[in-house]
């Protein structure tokens, strides 16, 4: 058992723009975060992950960076950031920030130089190609829809942008680019931050030749992930990144590893040779797609997570999560945010949280915050949502249907303001919020839930305390039980003589639990989300909709 401080943390993700506004301009800021640090400490948080607060024109909410060493005015100043770092450390917590190094903003000085002429010294810092006649260099589709190429009239060439056109991709084959990035990374680490969550890092290597995608359907642009996501040769860049930066400091690093399978994860998170301490994998998120009437596949979900648990056992470490700033709210997608909001928020929380790995909570998840239903596309801010909506309208879909699709798929679902109280704008701001507050804020907020012992918030406090209370829930071996059950996700965590059994019915119907190998007693029940009658030596019983239980067996 290889103990590390970062394996024992409880982490919390903050989306600064929506967390807390301190000056009434309707935008969350650094001083607002400082004002809520005691809330996070009381919750049981050890590590804060801060989404981008760098200088940015904000075409993609800060993931388009124009200056890596300065703070966006609406968030505050570098002095504010230094104060935040100090206040976090004063409370015994740690702070990591987003590191966005696949691309910059089109307003970054590097790109301004690069686009100025074909013979500029920084031309090769980005990826430029001539078009094919009047068309783009290839048929790749941007992750944010449309072409992945944008024409620059000044130099009459196209530049590659896997995300928005305002986010040109850096050329990682250029050593000068890599060296400048390493200097910037070490500058932040010398400032005293405790690490990074590294954004879109699996996209930094592009397939040689930038060839067209196969296009049997005759599409204008084709989804191109296989040409730029975890492609052959990326390990060279990852190894150098670690050697030049991370390995010199006692920090924690989390890679956003889209496209990395459990079988390939060794290169990314192996204890000694991996680039990162842990990674965010997205296989479990890919199980959900918007289709009317499509239910949540419990068995597929537990199969994916169990595969990751087993593949990294004794080799690497998992970063556990069910929500972040890029996906809709879990209770509204996988669960039932109407009849069983509280129950399913607790059930999904318990099942992921007590697996082996470092759990991350996204702001508002601990309250059971839900998706939002705006009345018009004009109320949305997310560039991906707006682009997708416009594409759907152009394809002949009605405005009503396109808007309903946005209700369930938009990234803005997780970016609505944090719900602190029942007062105006959920206590987030005394001004006009930059994006609309969810209408259910008077029922779902910190103030209300702190007073309710059965709230989702107080359940998360118990969950955090439980995770920290026994090493078996941190370092213990994970074993799935009831493998073929299509409704119940259940597993054990075992270390020496300590053993826990965690179970949840992840459906809105009753589910029969049957497992003869463990006889369960009510005296050993340590966490639950329904009232449970006294029982002794039970091996079968009924779990109510979204019921979860945790037993300490020994």
List each language-model region with its residue ranges:
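Beta-strand-rich binding/interaction modules
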Residues: 510-530
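Loop/helix patches that line or flank the sugar-binding groove of alpha-linked glycan CAZymes
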Residues: 5-6, 213-218, 222-226, 236-238, ...
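C-terminal beta-strand-rich structural cap/linker in extracellular carbohydrate-active enzymes
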Residues: 536-554
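Acidic/aromatic-lined carbohydrate-recognition and catalytic surfaces
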Residues: 2-186, 190, 203-261, 271, ...
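Short catalytic/ligand-binding loop motif for oxyanion handling, primarily in non-cytosolic enzymes
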Residues: 23, 56-60, 103-110, 204-207, ...
């Amino acid at each position: 058992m290889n103990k590390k401080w970062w394996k024992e943390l409880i982490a919390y993700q903050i989306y600064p723009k929506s967390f807390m506004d301190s000056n009434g301009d309707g935008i969350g800021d650094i001083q607002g975060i400082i004002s809520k640090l005691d809330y996070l400490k009381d919750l049981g948080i050890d590590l804060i992950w801060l989404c981008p607060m760098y200088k940015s024109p904000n075409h993609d909410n800060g993931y388009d960076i124009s200056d890596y060493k300065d703070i966006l005015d609406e968030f505050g100043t570098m002095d504010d950031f230094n104060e935040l770092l100090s206040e976090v450390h004063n409370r015994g917590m740690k702070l990591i920030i987003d590191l966005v190094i696949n691309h910059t903003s089109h307003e970054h000085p590097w790109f301004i130089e690069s686009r100025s002429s074909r013979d500029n010294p920084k031309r090769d810092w980005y990826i430029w190609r001539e078009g094919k006649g009047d068309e783009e260099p290839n048929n790749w589709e941007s992750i944010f829809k449309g072409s992945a190429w944008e024409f620059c009239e000044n130099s009459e060439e196209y530049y590659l942008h896997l995300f928005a056109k305002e986010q040109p991709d850096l050329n990682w084959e250029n050593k000068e680019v890599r060296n400048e990035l390493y200097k910037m990374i070490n500058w932040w680490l010398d400032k005293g931050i405790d690490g990074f969550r590294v954004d879109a890092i699996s996209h930094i290597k592009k397939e040689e030749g930038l060839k067209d995608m196969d296009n049997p359907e005759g599409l204008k642009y084709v989804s191109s992930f296989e040409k730029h996501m975890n492609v052959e040769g990326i390990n060279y860049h990852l190894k150098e990144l670690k050697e030049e930066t991370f390995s010199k400091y006692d920090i924690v690093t989390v890679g956003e590893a889209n496209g990395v399978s459990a079988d390939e994860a060794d290169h990314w998170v192996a204890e000694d040779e991996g680039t990162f301490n842990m990674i965010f994998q997205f296989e479990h998120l890919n199980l959900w797609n918007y289709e009317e009437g499509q239910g949540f596949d419990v068995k597929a979900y537990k199969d994916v997570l169990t595969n990751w648990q087993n593949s990294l056992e004794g080799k690497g470490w998992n970063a556990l999560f069910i929500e972040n700033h890029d996906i809709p709210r879990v209770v509204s997608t996988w669960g039932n945010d109407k009849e069983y909001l509280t129950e399913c928020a607790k059930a999904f929380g318990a099942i992921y949280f007590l697996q082996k790995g470092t759990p991350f909570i996204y702001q508002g998840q601990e309250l059971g915050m839900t998706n939002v239903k705006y009345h018009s596309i004009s109320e949305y801010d997310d560039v991906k949502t707006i682009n997708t909506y416009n594409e759907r309208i152009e394809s002949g879909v009605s405005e009503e249907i396109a808007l309903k699709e946005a209700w369930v798929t938009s990234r803005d679902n997780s970016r609505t303001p944090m719900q602190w109280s029942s007062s105006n704008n959920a206590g987030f701001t005394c001004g006009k919020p930059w994006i609309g507050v969810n209408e259910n804020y008077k029922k779902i907020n910190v103030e209300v839930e702190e007073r309710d012992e059965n709230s989702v918030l107080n359940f998360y406090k118990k969950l955090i305390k439980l995770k920290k209370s026994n090493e078996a829930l941190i370092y213990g071996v994970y074993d799935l039980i009831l493998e073929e059950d299509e409704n119940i996700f259940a597993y054990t965590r075992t270390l020496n003589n300590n053993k826990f059994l965690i179970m949840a019915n992840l459906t809105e119907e009753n589910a029969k639990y049957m497992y003869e190998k463990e006889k369960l007693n009510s005296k050993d029940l340590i966490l639950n989300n329904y009232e449970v009658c006294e029982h002794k030596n039970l091996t079968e019983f009924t779990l109510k909709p979204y019921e979860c239980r945790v037993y300490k067996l020994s």
